Amino acid sequence: MARLIIKEKDYGNHLFLVQLRNLDSQELMPGCEIYELGPKAFQGMLGTDNGALRFPNVRIPRNQMLARNVQVLRDGTYVPPKNLKHSYRSMVTVRALMAEITGWDLLKAVAVAYHYTTFRKQFSRSGNDQEAPAFNYASVRYRLLPLLAKATALVVVGQAIKRAYDEYTAKYLRTDKISQLEDLHLQTVGAKDYSTEITGYGVETCRIACGGHGYSALSGFGRIGTESSLPSFSYLSVLRDATSPQPLCIRSPSDLLMRDAQSFILEQQVAILVQQHMEDTKAGRDTSYACHALTMAHGDFIYWKGFWEAVDNIPSGELYKESMVVLAQLFSLSIMTSAHIVQCPLLTLTAAHRASLRLAYDAVIVEVAEKHAQNVINAYGFTEFELDSALARSDQSPYEALLDGAQKSEMNHMQHLWLMMVDTRKMWKQAQRDIQKDGVKSKL
């Protein structure tokens, strides 16, 4: 990406291809500077050669300019694109991919944590002498199972966004029809923020659920954590009445499993936040922090709607539809239960509503844990190579795999450093003796 300047007129940033190395000698081309950025944090992206790049003085031939939408003729004439919005495409492509890929990363973390917490036994439940798996405790289930539902939502909705973009590319790429591209651009902007935040916090939650072993690089969490068409927004129609929302009729926890109730709560939440954002903007207040809550609330509604659409598209005879329905309910209740920031709880719920929501949430958590969790995780079919974790091996327990990894560590074969360590220890002892002697002399 570089600024295009023709006859001292700046036409803004454009895309170019630049040859970095000589194909015969592998030496850098004149004017190119490349620097390797060093080790990667948390063992992530180790196979990617990230670096810094500078072009202090490089001439780029005209034929190395990406010229599908904009051209520079041989006489220097600039031919602008038919529509500037087509430049969204590269960003939309990357964000559409991220919306799904982050979901797979979170699923891997959940699978590893599930394997470990179902193996790890600690403490006995009342009236039972046998130790219980850590997964049986609510403190673990309430952390992992909502993440399983959210990761599934990220995958299925991310796939829908990517399909919508592929369909747009096939039909309208060479036309002036951009309304759908603008919509996809906005969707992928929100999806990127929503999916990366949920995945980032989710992977860390899975790591913490594995206790001390989650800190080990052998667990794989560090690597996972560092690598992760929808309809128009119907909540906009709610905005007109955001300041005086209609009462929500909930008589029992089961009412919260109805989509009309879920849709009302999520739409009303977004509408209220939009109204607040407009008022704050008009008053000149800094909305950068509150805008994030609005983005996440909007993401809740979009992913909720997309998840249920994906469930509805599953044929009724498919065996996995029941599990997907329950996961969709768990996702719905989880996003209604947890506010993204403290200042923005669900504004439309009364105390009685919240009590019903908690009871419904508890019931769905138990149902997923006892009937669906293992089948869903197994259905994703992650291989040991994909998980790359000592905590999720089929032929070894987590403790055996961790010990095996410890025995293979290069640090076990550092005999060539032992003499240096001994000499260093002697130097420190001598320094301590010298300090003690100097102290005695000063007293005398």
Which residues make up each language-model segment?
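Flavin-dependent oxidoreductase catalytic core characteristic
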Residues: 1-444
